[in-house]
């Protein structure tokens, strides 16, 4: 994989962050033409890859591509790294892969993604378990219609089980 792709640089990612997350541009195969993002389970085992089209994709291509059979509803991106961090601090939950990666690069290492704006029942269980030794969860979803709706649903479900804080972003369309 080519690790010095212009898209990664444009996103402001450092070579160290690109290496930490195993990011790279795929020139062949099912993820051809995409930035590849390895996805690990909570134990650090590789369970899949996401392919992100660099920039705005053509109309006939989705922005993200996941391998056939991969069920994102059962995984929480970056939980393997976030679980190793200091236990007393809250777990930050965001929507996207690059939200996690950018926050990680800025020093927020207790950050995970549900890989979309909709929290599944399985992801809810994983987050509750992962935050048992922390001071709750912080929801920081995109400031758009899907993000606000997903944040409200996640808040209602998670607040029954733990302390949840919400960090609304300052402007429409903003991402963490």
Regions found by a protein language model. Give the residues of each.
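Mg2+-dependent endonuclease catalytic cores in nucleic-acid-processing enzymes, primarily RNase H-like
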Residues: 128, 145-157
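Acidic beta-strand-to-loop metal/phosphate-binding motif
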Residues: 93, 134-146
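Short, acidic/turn-prone active-site loops that include or flank metal/cofactor-
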Residues: 114-120, 142-143, 169-171
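Conserved phosphate-handling catalytic cores of large alpha/beta enzymes
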Residues: 158-163
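Short hydrophobic alpha-helical runs that function as membrane-insertion/retention elements
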Residues: 111-113, 136-139, 165-166
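Phosphate-handling DNA/RNA-contact segment within nucleic-acid enzymes
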Residues: 21, 27-134, 151
